[in-house]
From Swiss-Prot:
It comes from the Archaea. It catalyses: CMP + ATP = CDP + ADP; dCMP + ATP = dCDP + ADP. It is found in: Cytoplasm. Pfam families: Cytidylate_kin2 (PF13189). One of its GO terms (cellular component) is cytoplasm. It comes from Ignicoccus hospitalis (strain KIN4/I / DSM 18386 / JCM 14125). This is Cytidylate kinase. The keyword Cell wall biogenesis/degradation does not apply. Keywords: ATP-binding, Cytoplasm, Kinase, Nucleotide-binding, Transferase. Its EC number is 2.7.4.25. GO terms for molecular function: ATP binding; CMP kinase activity; dCMP kinase activity. One of its GO terms (biological process) is pyrimidine nucleotide metabolic process.
């Protein structure tokens, strides 16, 4: 019942690594970020607007947390979730945090979303500011504290293939 949780800020490579790892290990892939993006689309707001709405309505985050926990309990899954490392830690065989310098993350998001570097940078800074406030208020923890993770990787220094191989070795 393997459970790998991959957390990190926007643009850190969570989805890329999680999808590749799930594929190579024959595990299910679950993305809390995709659920959050889908919810924003469904109600017709931007990610930043949904983040701001979640400040006032904790049920938005709790709904995603319940989904992450249920998937972790089912096992045989790679979960990609900004807060997954904190929420699903008791179920994780390997708890991974990916990061990269802000400039690199902005370049990745600009490429992924087809927006300018400046727009991506502004989006990241706005989202992270709201998220940090929201997460501290709702959960009482500091997302900058990484002690709970088994592996912390700067993905600007290590590509997705190397990260996947490192995680696979940790599962042996």
């Amino acid at each position: 019942m393997t459970v790998v949780v991959i957390s990190g800020p926007p643009g850190s490579g969570k989805s890329t690594v999680a999808k590749k790892l799930a594929s190579e290990l024959g595990l299910r892939f679950v993305s809390a970020g995709s659920v959050f993006r889908k919810l924003a689309e469904e109600i017709g707001v931007s990610l930043l607007e949904l983040n701001e709405m979640a400040l006032k309505d904790p049920e938005i985050d709790l709904r995603i947390d319940r989904m992450v926990l249920e998937e972790a309990r089912r096992g045989n899954v790679v979960i990609e979730a900004h807060l997954g490392g904190w929420v699903a830690a008791p179920y994780a065989d390997v708890n991974v945090y990916l990061t990269a310098p802000l400039e690199e993350r902005a370049k990745r998001i600009a490429r992924r979303d087809g927006i300018s570097y400046e727009e991506a940078l502004e989006e990241i800074l706005s989202r992270e500011e709201v998220q940090w406030i929201r997460f501290r208020k709702l959960y009482g923890f500091d997302v900058a504290s990484l002690e709970i993770f088994d592996l912390v990787v700067n993905t600007a220094l290590m590509g997705p293939e190397a990260v996947v191989e490192t995680i696979k070795r940790m599962l042996l």
